[in-house]
C-alpha cells in the first residue's frame, strides 16, 4: 500500500504537467521563464572542478608514488668507514707575507 502511494505521488507532477519527459529535446519548451545559461555554465564548471579535486585527492592518497612509500627500512646515513685515522694532522698554514700593505695603514681597502 505504501509503495502504491509513493508511486502515485511521484507520478502526479508528470500527469499534471504538459511536458513530455520522454522527449528531452522539447523539455526546455515547457517553461516560459527565460533561463540564465551563464549561471548554469558557472555552476556546472564549479561542480566539475570540485568533483575532480575530490577524486584526485582520493587517488593521490591511494597510489604509491616513490616519495609516499614507507621508507623506514632505508639507511639514514652512510656507514662510517673504519679505516680512517682518528688523528688527522693538517699541514702548517703558510706564513703571512713580510711586506706591509699601504691599504692596511690607511684603511682604504673597504
UniProtKB/Swiss-Prot annotation:
Organism taxonomic ancestry: Viruses, Varidnaviria, Bamfordvirae, Preplasmiviricota, Tectiliviricetes
Family: Belongs to the adenoviridae E3_14 family.
PTM comment, free text: Phosphorylated on serine; O-glycosylated, but not N-glycosylated.
Subcellular location(s) of the protein: Host membrane
Keywords carried by this UniProt record: Early protein, Glycoprotein, Host membrane, Membrane, Phosphoprotein, Signal, Transmembrane, Transmembrane helix
Keyword Membrane among record annotations: yes
Function: Down-regulates the EGF receptor and prevents cytolysis by TNF.
Designated name of the protein: Early E3B 12.7 kDa protein
Domain of life per record: Viruses
Signal peptide: 1-16
Record membrane topology: Single-pass membrane protein
Any one of the GO BP annotations: regulation of signal transduction
Spans traversing the lipid bilayer: 37-57
GO CC list: host cell membrane; membrane
Amino acid at each position: 500500500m505504501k509503495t502504491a502511494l509513493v508511486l502515485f505521488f511521484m507520478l502526479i507532477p508528470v500527469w499534471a504537467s504538459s511536458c513530455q519527459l520522454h522527449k528531452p529535446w522539447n523539455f526546455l519548451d515547457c517553461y516560459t521563464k527565460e533561463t540564465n545559461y551563464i549561471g548554469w555554465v558557472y555552476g556546472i564548471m564549479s561542480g566539475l572542478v570540485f568533483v575532480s579535486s575530490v577524486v584526485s585527492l582520493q587517488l593521490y592518497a591511494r597510489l604509491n608514488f616513490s616519495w609516499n612509500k614507507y621508507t623506514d627500512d632505508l639507511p639514514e646515513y652512510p656507514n662510517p668507514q673504519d679505516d680512517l685515522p682518528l688523528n688527522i694532522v693538517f699541514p702548517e698554514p703558510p706564513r703571512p707575507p713580510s711586506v706591509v700593505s699601504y691599504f692596511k695603514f690607511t684603511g682604504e681597502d673597504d
